[in-house]
Every structure is written in structure tokens, then in C-alpha cells.
Amino acid sequence: MANKLRSKDFIKIGVTSNQTISLAMGILKKYYKHDSNEMNLELIKQIKESPEEYYDDPILGIIAEEFYEYDETEEDETIELHKEEIELKVFGRPLIKENAFQQMKTAMTLPIVEHGALMPDSHLGYGLPIGAGLATKNTVIPFAIGMDIGCRMSLTLYDVTERFFKMHEHKFKQSIKDNTAFGLAKIISHKQEHEFLDRDIFSNTPLLKRLKSKAAKQLGSSGSGNHFVEWGIVELEDDEELGVPAGKYIGLLAHSGSRGFGASIAKFYSYLATNGSNLPYKLRHLAWLDLCTEAGQEYWMSMNVAGDYAIACHDQIHKNVAKAMGLKPICRIENHHNFAWKEMIDGHEYVVHRKGSTPAGKNILGIIPGSMTDPGFIVKGKGNEASLSSASHGAGRKHSRKETINRNTKSEMSKELKRLDVSLIGGALDESPYAYKSLERVMAYQDELVDVVGKFSPRIVRMDRDK
């Protein structure tokens, strides 16, 4: 979009609720950013006039719900929700805004939900808050995993000194500038090869078959928004799970997911789940698939394929950058944080959905990043079942993208980067450090969930939007 849409543009077409405007702006920016303002406003106008035509759309259905006028006569046609409140475990409630808390409380009324947990980094999301865990039995909710299936962290350590890093800082900077690609239409300039593309899984469903060319094209690239690849200083404590001695290392940290490949899978199966669902409209986007059905089994298989694709993308990122630097890795730590797993809780098997939350099973290693300037942490899980063996996946947003842009300036962000000796390649104002909660405070609320075994301090950060 050439010029940003403003609140007054929505008011002109009869959309006056600040909540609806904010929601619509966020979705349009994320999923329809290449359409014109006129096209986007016309789309919102159509949704407002005929919301029922968009309820089953996994993305636009969220906006359609804002225009829905509830009719009590329809109540008999809907699935009965939980009458008794299912316990929701909340960690770091003072850090969680009321809208995210209420969004999770609404999700907890789903009749298939058995357990739920909110992490201290939680904030409002689409369908389910970011920083949430949800446990069901033999059912999976595509939208509770999200559009970016397998979004993940991966950290590779190199046994080189900080002095070496400073001496060759320009080369380190060039290595991630030349060997990464961010955003919707961006791909790595040279052909990528990975064994993932040779697997016979692509013949399993017509959708996977259609998506193979997209997977090959986008392999090794990253998304936009808060996705990044960055060099930094790693300080490790002495811990046997790490497998390397305590001390300082140079690390390459990546955050991204399954790109358009995973998004296509998420959209397709979210539509299957919502189509014909008898859930109340406010919950329809959290419709589920039974794992005993063909659709449920297909989604579970496809979700795992998308997760493997995300791993393959990270493999290529680390391989390409390391090759450019002539470095050999000594350790890799990684984890998904948008995914579902079959796990045992209190002796029973559940499907644990993690949307923006880090797996924190007993002695499981994970990565919780800060912002583009604030250090992140390498953690070891304690297996706390109250949190569904989960922890935060970052600091979590304190301010929305719009609020961050309105309250901060590029000059202020540049000064903060300079003060903390961080070089930024690309990046946007809405990802300013100002946007995020204090990770130190977030970590203080989850000492029952994880132990800190290392720290990552960013030095060169690569994100979308080159400058």
C-alpha cells in the first residue's frame, strides 16, 4: 500500500469501533499489504455488509465476527460450550493485558479443551493469544497453532573469540546480508538444495503436491515482521545438556518459520475445520479437526511436514552463512514455538498446542530471544505440567505495531542501537525495542518453568526492509 490506511479511512466507510479498526489494520498489513488502499477498504466494506459470507475464512472471518449481531435464537444450533470453568494457569498476570487474558478465557470454553496456560509474554493474537498453551484430547485446532506452522528458533555456536568477531565485523555483517532473504517475495539468489525436497511426502496429498515448487523456491528464506537472523555473543554456563564447556562463543541466531508453504497448509485446513462448524461465531476460527478423521490425519501429517520444512529453511540459513564465514559449528540448539505435539500430562495423552510458547519439558533446551537490542536466554525446561511444560517464546509485545510507530521515532531507535553497540540491517520502526516487554521481568515470572543456562547478546541484526 502506497500510503498507510488511517482510522479516518475506516470511519468514512462506517467502521467506527477502535477495536475493529485496529484488528482490520493489523490483518490487512500482514496478509494484504500488496493490495491498494482502495481494494482493502472495499474488502472491509464488503465484510461489513455481508459478514456471514466471510465467517469460514480463516483470516477474514476474524474481522467478520466484529460485525456479527448475535441472535439468541441461534443458540440451540451451536455446540454446547463448557458450563464449568476449566482452570487456566497464568504465569506473570501483571504483564498480560486484559484483552489477551479474555481472549484465552474465551478459548477455554471450547468443549474439547482440557487444560490451558498463559505465559508471561502473552499478548493479543489471531484466534489465540501469542504465548499460549492449550491441551485437547485427540483433536487439533489449526488456528491455535497459527499461520506460521513451525515458527522456530535455532542457534549455532562457533568457537571463535569476541576479538576475532570485532576484527572481522564487516565480514560477519556481509555474511548475513548476502545469504539471507526476508519478506513475501524474497528468495535466496542461488539455488538451495536440501534432502527435504527429495522426500516422497509431497505425493501424500494434492495440496502438498501443489506446494512443492513453492517450498523449493522459498527454501532458506525468512518471513517479515519479527523474523530475524543475527550474530551475537553467547555466554554459556556449565551444564551437561549443552554438551560444550562453559565460556564465551560467537553465535548465529535465526527466527522464522515455514513461509508460504506452511501458511497455505494452515489456511486450507482452517477452512476445512470452520466450514460447517456449529461453534458460536465468536469461536468459529478455533474449530477443530478430529484426529480419527481423514481431514484430521491429513492436517497432522501436513503440519509435521511444514515443521520439517521450517527446520530445512533454518538448516540452509546456518549452512549458507557459515560457509561464507568459513566457520565450523560446534553446537546447535533449536525449538519450534508454533506447533502441536502429542504429550503425556498426568498419565494421559493430550494434543498440546503451543502458539508462541517454547517447549519446556524436563531438561529440554530452548531459546527465548529478547529484542533487537536486549539479550535473550538459552533455557532448560523443568517439565512443569501446570504450564503444559511450556515457557514464553520471547519478551512479548508491550505495544502494538501502530502504537510503537506513533510513540517512537527512527532517530530514537537509532540512538538506542548505537548506545548498545548493535548494527541493524533492515528492520522497521514497529520492531523497535520499545515495542517489547522487559525480558528480565518476563523471566522472573517463569523461574518455575525453566532454568537459564546461557545468554545471547545481539551484535548484528538482519531483518526485513533493507535501508
Residue ranges and their predicted role:
Residues 67-113, 189-192, 197-204, 218-221:
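N- or domain-start disorder-to-order transition segments that initiate the globular core
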Residues 106, 130-142, 157:
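Signature of the chorismate-utilizing enzyme
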Residues 7-9, 13, 96, 100-101, ...:
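Charge-biased, low-complexity intrinsically disordered regions
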Residues 141, 146-164:
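Catalytic-core region of right-hand nucleic acid polymerases
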Residues 52-93, 319-333:
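Polybasic, low-complexity association/targeting segments
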Residues 86-87, 96-99, 111-114, 126-130, ...:
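Domain-length cofactor-binding catalytic modules of enzymes
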